[in-house]
Every structure is written in structure tokens, then in C-alpha cells.
UniProtKB/Swiss-Prot annotation:
Protein encoded by which gene: MDL2
UniProt cofactor(s): FAD
EC annotation from Swiss-Prot or TrEMBL: 4.1.2.10
The protein, known as: (R)-mandelonitrile lyase 2
Domain of life of the native organism: Eukaryota
Length: 576
């Protein structure tokens, strides 16, 4: 018995050593550093902004996509970013990997960077309320979008620009993670149970097992989208925090309905107005909850719904707030017999049916909101491992509906209808069975409290897997009863329904949406890499559009003058 145990440990150590070598490829990414707050020179509290101002672009939401979008547009134009949340400097725990759990534990006082809500499904959830958005409160996982995702969007992407844009993001806020024991153990187990091939270190969404990028550096410092503001022109950028945008201002004439500005309030309740000049635009980057909410409050939505709420209809858009999705998260928690070090997610197991990862954590006495399905879930009194399954897509979808027609600070009612689509449920069953194999692997044997076969022998925190690994009905019940949010909700302002392929709101001039509300599926196992890229990408595309338009205008007005001058000169020459 002792000999076989020692052999297993030696084999495990060899696996870990080989895995570590495979993950040691060199990649040019960001260098470990302190979080760079240089951008604070052009950040203001909304209380200190003018009551009325005019800009080339107004961006509603300084989050994952909004910050790189603003930085890019500021190269040529004046940009105002209106962020409803606070500065990350107010909450230092945001800036550390240890703070991920702490920030979920912090009570929501209406100002804290993690805003709590409970979906119509009864599932605890959170959203970012801070400059940097969810990139400032998430688990730091960085992945490029699945190649097939681009093909499914209905958009003709400039893939050369996409890749250059990823590089622009990655050389500032993305890092190659150092060795973490639990993450390497997780990778070993994934390979053992057939999540192949071993892809080493890669930022690409690839089927198999790999080490991926992180927005936490190897000192545990968080880097987020706010730092991309440093790449902008400080003379053209103005960011206002604690700025709650209440409505979009529209004008209407023979050319149609046009967004010309926004109304926002500061923390004292004072009303401000900001307008766009000339060919400028209002761009919503308020996320899958905030962007549909603001459109509805501004009179853009299903006509009968808006009328029933006594909201004046500006434009009939039946799909605003429809088709919002959230990837279900199911999991198993194990309590090892001996303490394990805490780790952040850096190793991923990817298949076509499910995405998997694991974290190890210290014990806690206060429940992190949304981490477990509900407040009654048992809490760990020792270190534990959280082994997670994510359903890709998904196909199940729900709605965003207003709870207040006058106050944007009142969160809308969001329902996701988890597992209402049978394909999603089948993917959960498949994934949780694979987690059963994961628990049965040789790599996990040292973490049992009893030497029992298969999935037995673990000290399980919370709901255990069904004992019969072939009982699909029992697994379906498990999936439904133990579901939590992966915090990767998306949709509500879909391209092809609400937006055209340039992210413009159809039927309205000078209004776009650039954020996580725009697509019906998650772009990769973890979406933040795509939306960081999207902000920069769309900023570049808009600059290109403006340049082409201005060159055409210049040509059309300049050439006739040249011809007129030439004609006069020729006439004078012939006459003389």
C-alpha cells in the first residue's frame, strides 16, 4: 500500500514537472508593475463637471470596452466618459488577486465596486460599479476569442486589425502566470481524463488543456481596462465618475432621429447635460444590463411595452432587452485533508460541450455574494478547491425589464431562464460527468480523506455529485438545483436585431452600442479579452470612417475650387 502510494506521488510529481516545462514557453506580454493611475490627471467627480458641455464623442460606461474605446477615439477627437461608479483607488482590495473574494464579501452600500442583484431566477449575481467595470472585479482570466465566434457574428471583421488590437491590449495589462501548485495539478488531472491535447501556454481559445493569460501579474497586482486610458491623449480625454446617465437626448428632423447628447446626474442629484458636435456620436458601453436599460428609459424599445410604462416612444425596437444570456456555473467543492495554497484561475480545460477550471482558496466566514447559489450554502472552515464547469453559448435566454421608469440607479429585473434549453442541460450533464472523472483521477487521490474508489472518499462541501455516474436524470437534477452564475452574462442589444454590423442602433443616427450586450454567445471560455479588444477595434474603425468621410468631403469641396481657379487662369492666359 505504501509502495503504491509513493509510486502515485512520484508519477504525479513527474506529471507536474513535465507540465511545468511545457508551460514555460516565452511570450512577449506586459511586465510586472504597479497599477498605473497616470490617467487620474483627467478624471473628475461628476460634481465638479460643467452643467453643460460639448464633445465629439460621449461614452456611457468606463468599463471593459469603454476605456479602450475612449483612449482610441481621443487620438483625434474630444471624448467624455461617464462612469456611474467610483475610482478603484477608493477600494485598494480591488487591486490584488486576494481581493477577488473579499470584494464579493463586501456589503453593497450603493457605492461599493461590486453591485449585487438577484436575477428573476432567484440566483445571486453581481455587476461592476467602478471605473474599469467588471475587468476590475473579475478573476483575471484572459483569453482571445474563439476563431469560430468571429465567423458566427455576421460581421466582416478585419482580422489583421483584430490581432494588432489584441497585441495593443496584451502588452499593457496581460501576463504569463507563474507556477501555481493547484493550477498545475488541475492541468495534470485534465490531461489524465482526456481533455486533450496539451496546448502548453497560449492565449488562444483551443480545445484541450492549457495555461492561459491573466490580468493579475506575478506579484498578485490586478491590471484592468482603466490602465488603457493611459494610452489616450490627455488633452482630449475627460472622465467623470459618479455620473449616472439618466437618458439619451434625441432630435428629430427630415434626416430621422439623431442622438445628440445625454442627461446625467452627479452624486448630489444635480442634473448635467452633455452634447455631441458635428459628426460625433453617443456610444453606450454600459454592459448587458446597463445599455438595454438606458435605451428603454430613453424611449427605444418595444412600443407596446414602453407605452404601458408611460415612456414616450422615440424608436420602436422590439428586441431591446431581449435575448440576454448567462452561462451557467456548476461546481464541486472539495476539502482536502491537508491545507493547500490559494491560487487564481490560470489553467483551463476546453471541449466543444463545456469549459472547466478550478481555484483553490483559503477558508472564509462570510459568504462571497454570488460565489455559491444562495446565502444558505455551507461555508468552508478550511482551505478548499472549487472545481467549475461552464456551459458554452448558452442557448437559454431571458429579458431585461425596467423596475423604475424614472431612476436609472434602480437596477432592472433580469431573468436568464437557466437550462430552459435542453441542449444547455445536456452540456451540463456531460461536463459534470467529466468532473466525476476528474475526481476519480490519480492526480486527485492525495486529496481524499478516505482511500475509496472513484468519486468517493472526498470531503465534499455543499451538494455532491450523483453517486451513479450513468444516471442522466440525477445529473439533470443536480445541474438545476446547484446552478450559479458564471458572471459572463451577455446580450440584450444584439447585432442583427438592435444593431447593424457597425454596432449602430438601427433607425437612429449617431448612436452605437459597444459592449457585452451585442452578441448572443460568449466569445471564449472567458470573455474579457474579446471585449477589451472590441473597444479598441471599434475605436479604430470609427477613426477610419471619420478620416474617409472627411477626406471625401475635403475632396468634394476642394477640387471644384481648384478647377475654378484653373479655368480662370487659363481664361486669363488665353486673353492675354
Amino acid at each position: 500500500m505504501v509502495k503504491s502510494t509513493m509510486s502515485a506521488i512520484l508519477v504525479l510529481a513527474l506529471h507536474l514537472f513535465v507540465l511545468h516545462l511545457q508551460y514555460s514557453e516565452v511570450q512577449s506580454l506586459a511586465n510586472t508593475s504597479a497599477h498605473d493611475f497616470s490617467y487620474l490627471e483627467f478624471v473628475y467627480d461628476a460634481n465638479d463637471t460643467e452643467l453643460e458641455g460639448t464633445y465629439d464623442y460621449i461614452i456611457v460606461g468606463g468599463g471593459t470596452a469603454g476605456c479602450p474605446l475612449a483612449a482610441t477615439l481621443s487620438a483625434n477627437y474630444s471624448v467624455l466618459v461617464l462612469e456611474r461608479g467610483t475610482l478603484p483607488t477608493e477600494y485598494p482590495n480591488l487591486l490584488t488577486s486576494d481581493g477577488f473574494i473579499y470584494n464579493l464579501q463586501q456589503e453593497d452600500d450603493g457605492q461599493t465596486p461590486v453591485e449585487r442583484f438577484v436575477s428573476g431566477d432567484g440566483i445571486d449575481n453581481v455587476r461592476g460599479r467602478v471605473l474599469g467595470g467588471t475587468s476590475m472585479i473579475n478573476a483575471g482570466v484572459y483569453v482571445r476569442a474563439n476563431t469560430s465566434f468571429f465567423n458566427q457574428t455576421g460581421i466582416e471583421w478585419d482580422m489583421d486589425l483584430v490581432n494588432k488590437t489584441y497585441d495593443w491590449v496584451e502588452d499593457t495589462i496581460v501576463f504569463k502566470p507563474d507556477f501555481q501548485f493547484w493550477q498545475n495539478l488541475t492541468g495534470t488531472a485534465f490531461l489524465e481524463v482526456g481533455i486533450l491535447p496539451d496546448n502548453g501556454f497560449s492565449l488562444d481559445h483551443l480545445e484541450g488543456t492549457r495555461l492561459t493569460g491573466s490580468t493579475f501579474d506575478n506579484n498578485g497586482t490586478r491590471h484592468a481596462s482603466d490602465e488603457l486610458l493611459n494610452k489616450g491623449d490627455p488633452n482630449n480625454l475627460r472622465v467623470a465618475v459618479h455620473a449616472a446617465v439618466e437618458k439619451i437626448i434625441f432630435s428629430s428632423d427630415s434626416s430621422g432621429v439623431t442622438a445628440i447628447g445625454v442627461i446625467y446626474t452627479d452624486s448630489n442629484g444635480t442634473t448635467h447635460q452633455a452634447f455631441v458636435r458635428g459628426d460625433g456620436e453617443v456610444i453606450l458601453s454600459a454592459g448587458p444590463i446597463g445599455s438595454p436599460q438606458l435605451l428603454l428609459l430613453s424611449g427605444v424599445g418595444l412600443e407596446s411595452y414602453l407605452t404601458s410604462l408611460n415612456i414616450s416612444v422615440v424608436a420602436s425596437h422590439p428586441y431591446v432587452g431581449q435575448y440576454i444570456y448567462d452561462n451557467p456555473r456548476n461546481f464541486i467543492n472539495i476539502l482536502p485533508p491537508n491545507p493547500i495554497e490559494a491560487s487564481t484561475v490560470t489553467v483551463l480545460g476546453i471541449t466543444s460541450d463545456f469549459y472547466q477550471c478550478s481555484i483553490s482558496s483559503l477558508p472564509f466566514s462570510t459568504a462571497p455574494f454570488g460565489f455559491f447559489p444562495n446565502p444558505t450554502y455551507p461555508l468552508p472552515n478550511t482551505t478548499f478547491a472549487h472545481i467549475v464547469n461552464k456551459v458554452p453559448g448558452p442557448l437559454s435566454h431571458g429579458t431585461v425589464l425596467l423596475q423604475s421608469t424614472s431612476d436609472v440607479r434602480v437596477a432592472p429585473n433580469v431573468t436568464f431562464n437557466y437550462y430552459s434549453n435542453t441542449t444547455d442541460l445536456a452540456h451540463c450533464v456531460s461536463g459534470m460527468k467529466k468532473i466525476g472523472e476528474f475526481l476519480s483521477s490519480d492526480a486527485l487521490k492525495p486529496y481524499k480523506v478516505e482511500d475509496l474508489p472513484g468519486i468517493e472518499g472526498f470531503d465534499i462541501l455543499g451538494i455532491p455529485l450523483p453517486e451513479n455516474q450513468t444516471d442522466d436524470a440525477a445529473f439533470e437534477t443536480f445541474c438545476r438545483e446547484a446552478v450559479a452564475s458564471y458572471w459572463h452574462y451577455h446580450g440584450g442589444c444584439l447585432v442583427g436585431e438592435v444593431l447593424d454590423d457597425d454596432f449602430r442602433v438601427t433607425g437612429i443616427n449617431a448612436l452605437r452600442v459597444v459592449d457585452g450586450s451585442t452578441f448572443p454567445s460568449t466569445p471564449a471560455s472567458h470573455p474579457q479579452g474579446f471585449y477589451l479588444m472590441l473597444g479598441r477595434y471599434m475605436g479604430t474603425k470609427i477613426l477610419q470612417e471619420r478620416l474617409a468621410s472627411e477626406e471625401a468631403l475635403h475632396k468634394s469641396t476642394f477640387e471644384p475650387k481648384i478647377l475654378e481657379s484653373l479655368e480662370s487662369a487659363l481664361s486669363f492666359a488665353f486673353e492675354s
